[in-house]
Amino acid sequence: MNEFDRVRDYLTDLQDRICAAVEAADGKARFAEDLWKREEGGGGRTRILRDGAVFEQAGIGFSDVSGTRLPPSASAHRPELAGATWRACGVSLVFHPHNPYIPTTHMNVRYFRAERDGEVVAAWFGGGFDLTPFYPFDEDVQHWHRVAQALCEPFGEERYAAHKRWCDEYFFLRHRNETRGVGGLFFDDLGKEFEHDFAYQQAVGNGFLDAYMPIVQRRKDTAYGEREREFQLYRRGRYVEFNLVYDRGTLFGLQSGGRAESILMSLPPRVRWEYGFTPEPGSAEARLADYLIPRDWLG
C-alpha cells in the first residue's frame, strides 16, 4: 500500500472511531452521513450530529480531493509549487455543545501531496487540536494540555512547546487581540520523514478523545441559565470571525472549489453579536479574558 493510501485508511478509521465515541457520550442523537463528490477530483463524507442531549451540533468530515493547480492559500508560502497538481486528504471536526460549561473544540489532521510530471515534489502533514471554553476551569485546561504534552513526548523534548506556541500564534484574532481559546497543538509542513511524521499525526488524532471526552463528562450536567447561554452565543461569534477571516483550511477549501456545506460545517448553528458588549467586572464572563492570552498551563 502506498503512503497516501495508508494515511487515507487511517483517517477514515479515525472518523469512524470518533463518531462512535461521540454518539455514545451523547446518548440521544446519531450522525447523519452525506457522501459527496468533487467535480475536479475526489470527494468525501461529511457527518453531522444535531440536537443531541449533549451536542447542539457536532460535525466531522473526511475528504480526499485533488486538483490540477494549487490554490493561492496553499502555494503562497511555497511559490516553487505554483502550478503543480495536488492531492490532499484529511479529517476535520468541530463540536458545539449545548451546555456553555462544555468547551467548543476543533481537531484537524491532514496530508498533502504535490506532483509535477508524475513525480512527487512535496508532501507534508498538518493538523492539531484546540479548545475554546466560555466558562473555563483550570483543571480542564490543564488536563487538555497534559494529554497534548504526553502524546508529544516520544517525538522530542521540544515538540510540545513548539507546537503549543504555534497553536497560540495561529488561533489568534488580531482584530480582537485575543486567542480563540486556550490552545493545544498546531503543526504544518511536517514532511521530512514519512514514518516519523505519520506516527505523530496518528498520536494527535488518537489523543483527541483522551483530551476532550473527560471534560465533556465532567461538565455536561452543570446547571446553566439564560445568562450563560447568551454569553455562549456571543462568544461563538469570535469562532465565526476566526474561521471566515483567518483559517487557512477554510480559505483553501473555498479557493479550491470545495464543497461549501462541508467546509462551513465548523460554524455554530446559533450565534449572536452585540455591539459594544462588555462583561460586568468581576463576573464569570469577565474572567474569560484572563484565559485568552498565551500562557504555560503546566507550570
UniProtKB/Swiss-Prot annotation:
Keywords attached to this entry: Cytoplasm, Heme biosynthesis, Metal-binding, Oxidoreductase, Porphyrin biosynthesis
Statement: the UniProt record of this protein carries the keyword Ribonucleoprotein: no
Keyword hit for Cytoplasm: yes
BP GO terms, sorted: protoporphyrinogen IX biosynthetic process
GO cellular component, one term: cytoplasm
Positions that bind a divalent metal cation: 96, 106, 145, 175
EC number: 1.3.3.3
Gene Ontology terms for molecular function: coproporphyrinogen oxidase activity; metal ion binding; protein homodimerization activity
Annotated site, Important for dimerization, chain positions: 175
Region (Important for dimerization): 239-274
Chief location of this protein within or outside the cell: cytoplasm
CC cofactor: a divalent metal cation
Reaction catalysed by this enzyme: coproporphyrinogen III + O2 + 2 H(+) = protoporphyrinogen IX + 2 CO2 + 2 H2O
Class of enzymatic activity (EC top level): oxidoreductase
Residue positions of the active site: 106
Cellular localisation: Cytoplasm
Subunit field text: Homodimer.
Protein family per UniProt: Belongs to the aerobic coproporphyrinogen-III oxidase family.
PANTHER family named in the record: COPROPORPHYRINOGEN III OXIDASE, MITOCHONDRIAL, OXYGEN-DEPENDENT COPROPORPHYRINOGEN-III OXIDASE, MITOCHONDRIAL
Protein name: Oxygen-dependent coproporphyrinogen-III oxidase
Record organism: Xanthomonas oryzae pv. oryzae (strain KACC10331 / KXO85)
Gene name for this UniProt entry: hemF
